[in-house]
Amino acid sequence: MSTSFENKATNRGVITFTISQDKIKPALDQAFNKIKKDLNAPGFRKGHMPRPVFDQRFGEEVLYEEALNIVLPAAYEGAVAELELDVVAQPKIDVVSMEKCQEWTLTAEVVTKPEVKLGDYKDLTVEVEASKEVTDEEVDAKVERERNNLAELVVKEEAAVEGDTVVIDFVGSVDGVEFDGGKGDNFSLELGSGQFIPGFEEQLVGAKAGDTVEVNVTFPENYQAEDLAGKAAKFVATVHEVKAKEVPELDDELAKDIDEEVETLDELKAKYRKELEASKEAAYDDALEGAAIELAVENAEIVELPEEMVHDEVHRSVNEFMASMQRQGISPDMYFQLTGTSQEDLHKQHEAEADKRVKTNLVIEAIAKAEGFEASDDEIEKEINDLAAEYSMPVEQVRSLLSADMLKHDIVMKKAVEVITSSAKAK
């Protein structure tokens, strides 16, 4: 196989490569074996036409497309490897010549990884907004959240106030006509929770059990149901019960109810302080590391980032997001209807982060190369075992899912990140 590369522009070029007859002939045989089972010709049972007869009647050229599909991937990858190119997007393949008994010649328009000119990435000083300090107010707020989780709803006769829960039947209409989804029975609604559209809950403040309240609201312009968006609506709500939230006393008994490992409220607060300190310490470290990596990327120069790299990352990110939605039972159509957005909107939402991730990965890869990082067999084995433990998977299953090249890449990337973050300091 002969190969050549012609540079057309920054990070773009054309590979010309050939496929020899010793690769083409087996591919033609495979192509014939694949299609012959469906061949039905006079004088032969279906699927039993000999190859010479096929070539005579139809010409082997009929097999070229299928044979090319068979032989092309390895031929293209071989050309890229021989030329030592770092290709980052799907190529555009064109056939130059496919003559009988001769080598085939093809071209591939490719996009290559851009050059990264590194700036400072060690001993960086960065702004960190996160704080390690834990205040008494933060500890008290955590206790209060747990206290509220143990609150009970108690029926009251007085008028509803914000924070109370009302049990209501309601019927909604637009221009006197009821609409789908506008009716509910025995619905528990916490006033001030924002469960309903703006203005609804506020109009139930002051209501008592047995009251019927007319609620007038306007649906938001971006409401998910397009036929209701921006329209004025009237709801008739019948209040069955008003319930107040009754929280337990803030004392040692409450502390024991919250956490059976403590005996007093002071012990609970001390435990929460330690937990918050550990959490804020981790958040601070993450913020410091993130800021250092961001500065290292800002200090570097990426020579003409190919748009294809960002496009591919956007596509990957959107697919991952939609897969997570579907695992929650939300189809793409349902998501777009609920959010009032489109596929194009979703791609735009992911563009900025995708651009940032691509640039970050390029810079970290460049640092790993500059530092000469490699991954030893022992490090690869440790990475496999760590992943198996993290995801509760058999070691051999992890080994089968991840190639050695993928593992090596992850290891050297971690080493490069460590170079940036280990020497970084906060201002």
Swiss-Prot record:
- Domain PPIase FKBP-type, by residue range, is 163-248
Where it sits in the cell: the answer is:
Cytoplasm
Q: A Pfam family name for this chain?
A: Trigger_N
Chief localization class? Answer: cytoplasm
Q: Which PROSITE patterns match?
A: FKBP_PPIASE
Q: Which GO terms describe its cellular component?
A: cytoplasm
Kindly give the NCBIfam families that the UniProt entry links to this protein. tig
- Write out the domain note: Consists of 3 domains; the N-terminus binds the ribosome, the middle domain has PPIase activity, while the C-terminus has intrinsic chaperone activity on its own.
**What's the protein here called?**
Trigger factor
User: What organism does the record attribute this protein to?
Assistant: Streptococcus equi subsp. equi (strain 4047)
Its gene name is tig
